[in-house]
A protein has these predicted regions:
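Short acidic-glycine-tyrosine-enriched beta hairpin
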Residues: 63-77
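Generic protein-terminus/edge-of-domain signal
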Residues: 1-60, 64-67
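Well-ordered beta-strand positions in beta-sheet-rich domains
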Residues: 65-67, 81, 126
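A hydrophobic/aromatic-rich effector-binding and dimerization subdomain
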Residues: 2-21, 85-145
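Short beta-strand His + acidic residue motifs that chelate non-heme Fe in jelly-roll/DSBH
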Residues: 58-60, 76, 81-87, 93
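Residues immediately flanking
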Residues: 54, 78, 97-99
């Protein structure tokens, strides 16, 4: 089912990042300012990394519920249906990337990111990182901002 087929069934968010191809937001700020209801199933046309640093609950992706706890990182692709159970209790980072940002398939690192992480058919759409990795990732996100 592609994004156009989802029109009318789920709220569609197509505002892809522009400029340098990615945008970083922080939870709960971007969730509270959002023009959509993130607690309702929705779909968008960009890649998104959701890093949950604090809070616990459920994040539903493609009709499957996944437990959220600190250190959980979701990798969402265009067209995936997802929603949060309660957006006010989460703190973390959202990195949104337009499809052009992920288009480079000449670099082995880009291929791995795109197909081993975002489009992995044999693994759930998330990873859980430990505290040391979270510190390193926090520095990387800071540098990206």
């Amino acid at each position: 089912m592609n994004t156009e087929q989802l029109e009318g069934r789920y709220q569609t968010v197509c505002a892809a990042p522009s400029g340098n191809g990615f945008r970083i937001g922080h939870m709960p700020d971007f969730l509270m300012r959002s023009d959509i209801n993130d607690c309702a199933p929705h779909v968008h046309a960009f890649y998104e990394i959701l890093w949950f640093q604090q809070g616990e609950g459920i994040h539903t992706v493609d009709f499957t519920d996944y437990e959220v706890k600190p250190g959980t990182i979701f990798f969402l692709t265009p067209g995936q249906i997802h929603h949060f159970d309660d957006k006010e209790r989460y703190h973390g980072v959202s990195i949104k990337m337009c499809t052009d940002f992920m288009r480079d398939e000449k670099d082995p690192g880009s291929l791995s990111l795109k197909y081993d992480i975002f489009h992995a058919f044999d693994a759930p759409p998330y990873y859980i990182i430990d505290a040391d990795t979270a510190v390193t990732l926090g520095r990387i996100v800071e540098a990206m901002e």
